[in-house]
Amino acid sequence: MNFHPELSKISQVTNNIFLSGVFPMEQDPTVIKKLNIKYILACLDRQYVSDAHNAVLIDNPECTILYLPYDDDVSQNLWCKNKNTINLVKYTRTMEEYNCLYKQFQMYQNKPMIEIGYHFINNAVESGNNILIHCMAGISRSVSTLTYYLMKKYNIPYSQAIKYVKDRRSIVNPNDSFKLQLQGYQSKKENFIESDGKKVTDFFKYGQSRLK
């Protein structure tokens, strides 16, 4: 089986935004500190990357990690609401830091997970900090979340946003359900909600006849 070289690479997408899978951190946990990354948006369940992230946090204790537990599956609704499913992790040294982190965690309750991702990315970028967005391979889940950020932030269509990312990381390829959900957002903008995402996932689960 061929191993694409980009799987072991952290790709720089903008001045502050980086994209990858977990492999670069497994190979070298110090790479996060070397790239001056202060925020990590992990678009997968924490259990799959806990060892790699623990090593990162030991080397870079100022880093904040947000976990959006997405599955790379056509049944995954990117707009599903957070019902105590996300994790927000940071080594806090003072009660003030802890309270700030807890306030942020509470603010994310009952919000669409992709919107939480947008907020987390935007906060990092607006504060001038570097952020890594990753999933297992840096191909589908993390790419979809980043593409949504670009679409919303710059009011651009899906095709333009995904091309921008693909020009900087050639292996990107969101699954078909994620593509349709993002294209649905393109059509409806902020009116695209969790039930719209469910229509897309139901299409793949049941077929078009069940959507009528």
From Swiss-Prot:
Pfam families linked to this entry: DSPc (PF00782)
Organism lineage: Viruses, Varidnaviria, Bamfordvirae, Nucleocytoviricota, Megaviricetes
Gene3D superfamilies named in the record: Protein tyrosine phosphatase superfamily (3.90.190.10)
SMART domains: DSPc
SUPFAM superfamilies named in the record: (Phosphotyrosine protein) phosphatases II
EC number(s) on file: 3.1.3.48
EC category name: hydrolase
Protein name: Putative tyrosine-protein phosphatase R622
Organism of derivation: Acanthamoeba polyphaga mimivirus
Reactions it catalyzes: O-phospho-L-tyrosyl-[protein] + H2O = L-tyrosyl-[protein] + phosphate
A single GO BP: negative regulation of MAPK cascade
Family: Belongs to the protein-tyrosine phosphatase family. Non-receptor class dual specificity subfamily.
Stored InterPro entries: Dual-sp_phosphatase_cat-dom, Prot-tyrosine_phosphatase-like, Tyr_Pase_dom, TYR_PHOSPHATASE_DUAL_dom
Signal peptide stretch: none
Keywords, sorted A to Z: Hydrolase, Protein phosphatase
Recorded GO MF terms: MAP kinase tyrosine phosphatase activity; MAP kinase tyrosine/serine/threonine phosphatase activity; protein tyrosine/threonine phosphatase activity
Enzyme active site: C135
Transmembrane found in the keyword field: no
Domain Tyrosine-protein phosphatase: 9-191
